[in-house]
Amino acid sequence: MAKRNAVVVTHTRLRQTGTVVAEAVSQLRVAGFEVTIIDNTEAPDFGVQPPCVSDDTEIVVVLGGDGTILRAAELVHCTQVPILGVNMGHVGFLAEFESFQIDEAIRRVATHDYSIDERMIAHVDVWLPGATKPIEDWALNDITLERADRGKMVELSIRVDDVEMNSFGADGVIVSTPTGSTAYAFSAGGPVMWPNVKALQLIPLAAHALFARPLIIGSGSTFTIDILDDSMSEGWICCDGRRQRALPQGTRVMVRESRDTLRLARLSGMPFTNRLVSKFDLPVVGWREHARNEASSQPLHHGHTFPAAAYAAGVAGDAGVAGTEPDKPGERDGKAGA
């Protein structure tokens, strides 16, 4: 029988990690895997590729949140080895299972009962002033270029396919993949992009400009971001919140789709739309509909109820009782709107 190798990447600071790791490793070994545990992955320097897992690794099982999955991505970026995420964090958007489902997850891995979801990766070239070749890096989620001086703006010029689109002072910009569109880019006001969309988006951060809106480009295009020579602040680049370095004035940053992809193991056929609604707990019923539903059970003076349609019209049929004012936006269920 051929040897089967698995790598388990863990989040060391989560209280419940130890028990789940022990269970996962035990079950993998029972299934015939030789298991390597990685529990401390320091962020490498920008432009430096850390050692990857061996090509004969069958799967990398990640026990943690999305941040732990991003750490694991550095170990498989240069391989075809898939990642299976078991969520032990908060949202766990990239994870496939929750920690209480670890038994089923390992069983499915052992029987090869999973599909592969290939995710687009962004490639970045950083040209320092006077450089003859770029510093290269990549990102599964996003690449941020922000001001190095917290008290000043960084002055940027934005080009798409060598055509200048805009220039402004700002806190910085985010360039996001579809995978990263539900992360920092989403918090900064960018749209959600479905994973099968081959595109990159650029979101300005607090730009001092009349026109500074998110831009989306196709997979054959390139974002070019120049830190202007007279910028008040130097820049600071960061890939996936981990690999980072300072950038002086006059630096050029070019971001495009990478030829590589990252492979996520999927154990269910849940569409991305369902995953989006579930993970973000989206309020799919608007506040007006919520008010109608509440009204359908409102008692009349005679101890009866009237239908929601009558409530919405402000009357209650023959009873002649006017509907009360519906809830205001933001006051339903104590939840903020999506």
UniProtKB/Swiss-Prot annotation:
The keyword NAD applies. It catalyses: NAD(+) + ATP = ADP + NADP(+) + H(+). It is found in: Cytoplasm. GO terms for biological process: NAD metabolic process; NADP biosynthetic process. NAD(+) binds at residues 66-67, 71, 141-142, 152, 171, 182-187, 206. Residues 317-338 are annotated as: Disordered. Gene3D superfamilies: Probable inorganic polyphosphate/atp-NAD kinase, domain 1, Probable inorganic polyphosphate/atp-NAD kinase, domain 2. Its cofactor is a divalent metal cation. GO terms for molecular function: ATP binding; metal ion binding; NAD binding; NAD+ kinase activity. The keyword Ribonucleoprotein does not apply. It holds the Pfam family NAD_kinase. The active site is at residue 66. InterPro entries: ATP-NAD_kinase_N, ATP-NAD_kinase_PpnK-typ_C, NAD/diacylglycerol_kinase_sf, NADK. Belongs to the NAD kinase family. This is NAD kinase. It comes from Bifidobacterium longum subsp. infantis (strain ATCC 15697 / DSM 20088 / JCM 1222 / NCTC 11817 / S12). The lineage of its organism: Bacteria, Bacillati, Actinomycetota, Actinomycetes, Bifidobacteriales. The gene is nadK.
